[in-house]
Amino acid sequence: MEVHVVSSTVIPQSLPPTETTKIPLTVFDMVIPNIHMAVLYAFMPPTPTNTALKHGLMKALKLFPTLAGHLSGNNDRRRPSVSVGGNGGGVLMVETNIALELLDILPLEPSPKLLQLHPQTDIAQHLLQIQFNRFSCGGLVIGITNHHRVADGKSMSSFFVTWAKLVRGLHIDKFPVYDRTMLIPRDPPRCDHDHWGIDFQPFPLPPSSLPSPLKSNKVCNVVVHYSVDFISKIKAQMPRKHSTFEILAAHLWKKVTRARGLDLDTLTEMSVAVNGRSRLRPAVPSEYFGNMVLNTIPRAHVKEVTEGSVADVARLVHDAVGRIGDGYIRSLIDFWEINSGDELVSVADVEGPVLCPNLEIDSWLGFPSHEVDFGAEGSLCGFLPSWVPVEGLVILKPNVVGKGGVDAVVALFEDHARLFKQISHSLD
């Protein structure tokens, strides 16, 4: 696939340079890895013009100004912020042509080739980067990267939906919330939970905390589809009610661990991303723009995971998720305040590219991908990460091509991936 770049421009911030506002990053922004995230949306023709998309984008950025801002003090682990207005910032917009029909590359599955469909993340100069990839048939793939410390997946989903509505000329009735007063520490602050080694590490890092180099084994991305019928069969095995996420997380933990062939007495962990908005008291509005995701970590020995029932493993996941409540969130806010004079490093930044014997599972199931409709009657035919390079990372996403159910993107070494595909749908 040859991607021909037609133009590359920067959409400036909507505020004049004389008006500058600094929005401090919260502890929830800083516990997130310091990286750009990438996602692809693919649409069958007919699709709106790039000009229409750009005009809608400029309107959306007035509502989501931090996406066009710039990080100030990004190297200061104490109190960085997003500067809106002033010099710098803006959004990178790239336009490309591809001399293929979109059908020629469908169905889209994560691959290093798809990295061409969005701006590079490792040398990003802007918090938000967007690439419009036009195919010969009129099909469109929009590749987006955003700095994770400015917004989580829930926030970016709200941005995509708003942008799409503005392109279609629709009324916007939900606006982003930037109020940080909901996240202030208690007086006096106190830590009721241990956050060292779980959320943050002190700086400088001890040598034992540094990431290990990537092994020579090639990491590949496996996409497996779990139909509504298959999910119902797993739920039928449950003596108590569990969410779709919990049962699929348990099922995948079992299958990935078995595919890796680990010793039965090895301890394995699964990092689970939890949206904290509704878990704080009072709850943070769902429109809150920024990060409000925390990780919780169920642990067990390989024997318990591989030989235990799906119900047993789902209970481990359920109990770990349940530990993320108002008390834990308030404790983390206070931890950040108590250690305000120290340099802290997110544990997520020192994990490295190989998670084995552990894994991480992120859910995109609650993202309203079906509402990302830019009009012109073009139907959504792809919603996915471009490529997952981290061994042991799993992403659950809704299937958007009419099958329903859930797609799981699983990044594993090749030899483990082959076995995983063979056992991915076994119910034992």
Residue map of PLM features:
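Low-complexity, glycine/alanine/valine/leucine- and proline-rich hydrophobic stretches
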Residues: 349-428
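Detector for long, low-complexity, acidic/polar
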Residues: 23-24, 28
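Soluble acyl-CoA-dependent acyltransferase catalytic core bearing the H(X)4D motif
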Residues: 4, 8-20, 31-369
